[in-house]
Amino acid sequence: LEELNISEAQKKRLFFSLLNSRVILSTLRAACRLKNRKFPEGLEDIELRYDNSDNFFKSLEVPCNGKQLFAWASNIERNIYKTIDSFIPEVDVVVEGHDELISLLVLTPQNLYYQGKSLCSRILFMFDDAHKLSDPQRSLFKQYILEKRSGANVWISERLEALSPDEQLKSFEGRDFEELNLENFWNKNPSKLKKVLRNISDKRAALSSEEVTSFQEYLSENLSET
């Protein structure tokens, strides 16, 4: 996509359109596996009950079944591949698509059904090898995920070398770490604290070269604060 002789806006549109088509196709395949159905036969029992209030779908009438949704996404993917493989790509690329990841907004537990019942209670979108994206694509992708903050659960994997020094050093509370005040926590659970400390001390004692079997026997029964 980056090598096409088209505008940056068109590249962005093609990139998100290709991502959307692949996410939709992968989700439909996963839905068949979830319900132990053969693919693509099981697609007819899957429904997308989306009201198209945001006008995301122009050539697809929704609500629709999985077979219709699969055909729509496959057609977009084919058209993008034709554009990429063309030796002389048209200046005005015409592909039905979007400037955002509509797949994450549309493919929700509230919109997906199987044989008239909810397909699942939660969905996790997993993006592997994000480091293989070009720098502009990776930046667009991450920026959208962070800024949109949709209700979708998204998991992204990439090699460490793809991260900038700032990304490698930056950490966020709740995502990378959780601050826990041990004193406040154990004050509410003194018996648990005693049990944990005894367990730790006995394991340390077992590793001692002094043939110490229990750390507790070396402690005074009554300790007074000074």
Q: What is each of the regions a protein language model found here?
A:
Residues 15, 19, 23, 137, ...:
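Short amphipathic alpha-helical segments
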Residues 102-109, 114-124, 133-226:
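The catalytic "switch" region of P-loop NTPases
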Residues 1-6:
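Nucleic acid-processing catalytic cores of prokaryotic defense/repair systems
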Residues 17-86:
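Coupling/switch/interface segments within P-loop NTPase motor domains and analogous charged loops
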Residues 128-129:
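Walker B catalytic acidic pair
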Residues 88-110:
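Short glycine-rich substrate-engagement loop in P-loop NTPases that contacts/grips substrate
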Residues 31, 35, 81-84, 88, ...:
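Residue-level signal for secondary-structure boundary elements
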